[in-house]
Amino acid sequence: MQITTLFTSKRILNLFATVFIIALLIAPTFSHVAQAATAKEIDVSVDVALDRFKNDVKGASEFLANAKGVLVIPNVIRVGFGLGGEYGEGALIVGGKTVDYYNTVAGSFGFQIGVQSKNIIIIFMEETALTKFRDSLGWRAGVDGSVALIDQGAGSSVDTDNLQHPIVGFIFGLKGLMVNLSLEGSKFTKLIK
């Protein structure tokens, strides 16, 4: 009588080979992440993301005009293959000027596969929320501050009169605001640039 097992050495070897090949295919996507962007490169990307935000989201200019501070993290790359992770670098703008640089890191587990790029804009509407963010050593969305995430879809307008939250967030891609996304668990940490 012969007993067969589900995990033979050949199957385990094939699994490792498959994971290795997928990692090799995905690695070029993150080559720019491994090389941290310069302050100038971040500033250029932030300007592009802000312009796209103003053009794609009706009411965006009002939000920006009333903001105490704006955190812009452009080109956040998210990769998932069972385990997922994302990374991006951006700038905090106060009074129309960049005052600090930040990165964001998040991880997740579950059914996910693929690569996605997105832009994150977090608008601090109250000075106390901005101060708490700037004073933190590593600020987590949903833990250190609650973010009202606007995800009404591309072409939608945002009513700034009825939205009274200290921190408002937007996630958008190439086609406008993205829906069904979250900032929960995303960590934002100040960079030295």
Where are these regions (language model features)?
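Bacterial N-terminal signal peptides that target proteins for export
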Residues: I3-F20, T29
